[in-house]
């Protein structure tokens, strides 16, 4: 397991709070405690885990306007896209979605609802907070939660009127406009605006890549339009409430834009003569019904949610033009019961869960003179699960926790097509049962200092390839499973927050791509081990001022008995990472000034299992200055990537040569927000 080299680091992490113990004070009552939607703040699952919670003001200060910018404020998290925003590449703690872009290693939740995998990268609308839970969360969250969970919590309408308008412009003719209005319709009963709690967002982030064949010079960017409506029925002095939310998002993108591997400062695409511009249009509709009933000892939650997504995608691939429209439908239902109150010896959570996903894919690969390949595929996946999570408070300082989840997964596929006039097709069905568990123990050494240990399991279910492959049968792959061992500590006072952990994760039956180039399919082909240590600290060293610092070192490798990549590094996992920021408030007679300076370091990593395509270490520096011009007006200017550092975000072998996607470089902008109330 190669844990010996981590023991000194683990010991150091446990001793860190002792250094700061001279500053011990009672924890500020306003300290935000992670709840992660499914647990009580007193549960072992919420406390015996490495977690980070970021508030809306912190997101705004860091310029986090979309989920792929969350690594700026969530240490250890890495998010990029592989081609375009439909296919996110996420890594956390050495667990990576490198081998299956339809199943990210970290699951994104919005108000307790899991998002479609192709909707993981999305604009953020009216966010109240973001929570990150590190390590497998399989017992409470089920499949595809091997690396962890990101839970976005949005602002819910209540009796307080709220409203604002926001706008900004930035480099490459980009701009952003946003409107929000919420409040009581009938005070004490129904909350929302006249038509509900409304948020409207238009976000344009243009690129600067050039297609020499068409002359287009703004490729590589996105243009998103989003609207949502919320209603909340919550009568005063009643133990129940109900909610409804609906949203629609449409994004146009030109992101399938690549340059030569060694031409990362160039703007001309590596593309065949006469090739059209890449284009993608994604539209997603979401609806959620929720209810809550509270007694003296229990709280019951019911959620039913639906998502419908369709997208069209066209891009050049060598001498071929690819058209790949796709439709997704997903519905989720969950019933959850949890204990309530602070005087209980045992806290409990019980739940029933169902998730059904259906997908249809049409694809066509055309040569200049004739069709090459066309196919139509249908896949389904369904999960039925029951889970429980218990915490036994042995004393007021010592607790132990355990959880178990039983899942029944079903999947099916049916596809047909033609390759150079030769038909192909197949169909299949599979089902599988999984039992996952987790155990943890935590002890409060002082009122501010906690140590814990945790063992938890995660998995990705069995299933079929989304994209049909000519000449191959419909053969399912089995579930990928992982187990994580963790030792950590957390120290919190009004002035200092410290968190450290060391971990080891073993993954088996990895779902890897295998087969000849152009005919690759997912199959079970290997194991991987990830070991690492992480540290996160925040010091509020003066009124209105704080200093954040974080870092991690990770070794994530395929084991020697892996069929394809034995001994190689797992792709998309940086060997190390670090970040630091200083935030402050300077009071002046003309209004408060709010400076921020942040640096982020990303270590070397590979884009392929063969470890041929390597991105070296890079660092970026971001700065901003906010001005509270009046009580209701805020103006901020910012420069992201101040020194215009260019680096690769994704790459692959195109024939005998490699191509890469690169970041956009320096971005300068200004934002203004005006509050109505």
Name the predicted role of every residue range:
Residues 228-235, 245, 337-340, 345-355, ...:
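Structural signature of Gram-negative outer-membrane beta-barrels, strongest in the C-terminal barrel
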Residues 348, 396, 400, 408, ...:
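Gram-negative outer-membrane beta-barrel transporters
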Residues 67-70, 89-93, 129-132, 144-168, ...:
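N-terminal periplasmic accessory domains that precede
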Residues 178, 290-315, 444, 450-456, ...:
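Membrane-embedded beta-barrel scaffold of Gram-negative outer-membrane proteins
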Residues 159-160, 166-168, 180-276, 308-319, ...:
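Periplasmic-side early beta-strands and strand-to-turn transitions of outer-membrane beta-barrels
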Residues 111-136:
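Short acidic/polar hinge/loop motifs at secondary-structure boundaries
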């Amino acid at each position: 397991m190669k844990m010996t080299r981590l023991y000194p680091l683990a010991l150091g992490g446990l001793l860190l709070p002792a250094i700061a113990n001279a500053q011990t004070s009672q924890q500020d009552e306003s300290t935000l405690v992670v709840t992660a939607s499914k647990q009580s703040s007193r549960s072992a699952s919420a406390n015996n885990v490495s977690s980070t919670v970021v508030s809306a003001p912190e997101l705004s200060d860091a310029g986090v306007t979309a989920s792929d910018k969350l690594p700026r404020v969530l240490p250890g998290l890495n998010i990029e896209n592989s081609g375009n925003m439909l296919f996110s590449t996420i890594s956390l703690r050495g667990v990576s979605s490198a081998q299956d872009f339809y199943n990210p290693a970290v699951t994104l939740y919005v108000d307790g609802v899991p998002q479609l995998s192709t909707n993981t990268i999305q604009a953020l609308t009216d966010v109240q907070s973001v929570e990150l839970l590190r390590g497998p969360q399989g017992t409470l969250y089920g499949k595809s939660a091997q690396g962890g969970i990101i839970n976005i919590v949005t602002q819910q309408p209540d009796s307080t009127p709220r409203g604002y308008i926001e706008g900004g412009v930035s480099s490459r003719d980009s701009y952003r406009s946003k409107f929000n209005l919420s409040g009581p319709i009938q005070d004490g009963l129904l909350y929302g605006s006249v038509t509900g709690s409304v948020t409207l967002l238009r976000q344009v982030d243009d690129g600067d890549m050039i297609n020499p064949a068409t002359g287009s010079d703004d490729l590589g960017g996105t243009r998103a339009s989003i609207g949502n409506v919320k209603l909340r029925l919550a009568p005063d002095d009643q133990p129940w409430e109900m909610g409804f939310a609906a949203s629609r998002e449409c994004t146009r993108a030109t992101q399938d834009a690549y340059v030569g591997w060694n031409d990362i400062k160039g703007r001309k695409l590596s593309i065949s003569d006469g090739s059209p511009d890449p284009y993608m249009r994604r539209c997603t509709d979401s609806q959620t019904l929720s209810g809550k009933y509270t007694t003296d000892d229990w709280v019951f939650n019911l959620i039913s949610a639906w998502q419908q997504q369709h997208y069209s995608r066209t891009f050049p691939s060598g001498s071929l033009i690819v058209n790949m429209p796709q439709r997704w439908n997903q519905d989720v239902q969950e019933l959850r019961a949890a204990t309530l109150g602070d005087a209980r010896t045992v806290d409990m959570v019980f739940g029933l869960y169902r998730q059904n996903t259906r997908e249809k894919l049409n694809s066509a690969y055309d040569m200049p003179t004739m069709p090459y390949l066309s196919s139509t595929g249908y896949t389904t996946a369904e999960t039925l699960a029951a889970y429980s999570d218990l915490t036994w408070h042995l004393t007021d300082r010592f607790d132990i926790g355990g959880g178990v989840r039983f899942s029944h997964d079903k999947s099916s596929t049916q596809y047909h097509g033609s390759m150079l006039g030769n038909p192909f097709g197949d169909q299949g069905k599979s089902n599988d049962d999984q039992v996952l568990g987790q155990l943890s123990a935590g002890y409060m050494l002082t009122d501010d200092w906690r140590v814990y240990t945790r063992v938890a399991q995660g998995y990705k279910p069995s299933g079929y390839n989304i994209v049909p492959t000519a000449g191959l049968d419909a053969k399912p792959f089995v579930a990928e499973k992982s187990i994580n061992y963790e030792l950590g500590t957390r120290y919190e006072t009004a002035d200092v927050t410290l968190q450290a952990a060391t971990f080891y994760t073993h993954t088996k039956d990895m779902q890897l791509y295998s087969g000849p180039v152009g005919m690759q399919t997912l199959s079970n082909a290997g194991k991987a081990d990830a070991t690492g240590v992480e540290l996160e600290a925040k010091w509020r060293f003066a009124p209105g001022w704080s200093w954040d610092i974080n870092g991690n070192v990770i070794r994530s490798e395929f084991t020697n008995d892996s069929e394809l990549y034995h001994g190689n590094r797992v792709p998309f996992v940086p060997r190390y990472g670090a970040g630091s920021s200083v935030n402050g408030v300077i009071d002046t007679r003309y209004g408060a000034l709010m400076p921020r300076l942040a640096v982020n370091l990303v270590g070397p990593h590979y884009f392929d299992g063969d470890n041929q395509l390597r991105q070296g270490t890079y660092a970026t520096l971001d700065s901003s200055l906010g001005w509270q011009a009046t009580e209701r007006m805020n103006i901020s200017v910012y420069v992201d990537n101040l020194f215009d550092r260019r680096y690769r975000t994704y790459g692959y072998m195109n024939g005998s040569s490699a191509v890469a996607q690169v970041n956009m470089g320096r971005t300068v902008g200004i934002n203004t927000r005006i509050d109505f109330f």
